[in-house]
Amino acid sequence: ESYQLWLDSKTQEAYDIAEIAKAKGLDFSTEIEIPRASDLASRTEKLLEEYLKGLEIEEGLREILLNTDRESASIQIAVDVAKRMYSRDGDLREAIDCGLRVGLAVLTEAVLVAPLDGIGAVRILNNSDGSEFLSIDFCGPIRAAGGTAQAMCVLIGDMIRRELGIGRYTPSTSEVERVKEEFGLYRVGLQYKPPPEEAVSYTHLTLPTTGDG
């Protein structure tokens, strides 16, 4: 405990020195770019403050984390943030985007670049019948999150779109046939290679959102 207190004290001294140096105006910014954070809830809010636009989530997330596991907490806080942002600003796409990033940040301990640069865009598109569905565009840095977090991100998107009343993705016949063809062409190094029909029935046809990129 005394060692932790010493670390906190010395870190604060370093920040005090940095503030004095920044105040001279010789750098590009007069503020310290790396904010201090004490736990996951604090890190998440500070990491995504540009997307949250003043929405406070630290205390709420901390309480959720005390009562549930991190995976469940990521879904709960993502849905909560999306609903609050949509209620406050009225921008559905932006609310979903922010909720997704918050959920992904919780999954990755808010120490990776994935919540910032791994999600390229969130779009609300239309099925052939005119109904809406959610599309998530992923970028290269999402790989830093790992496979489980990437899959969870799609699940979080599905939970958010349900809460906000967005319909599910309905693939066309041509899209299904394309997946069946490409699955056979690109499957490499799998321990189990299901036939195209099985692969489609368990993934593409039951996927309520689309992931691009």
Predicted regions and their residues:
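Extended, Lys/Arg-rich, non-catalytic nucleic-acid recognition/anchoring regions
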Residues: 1-205, 211-213
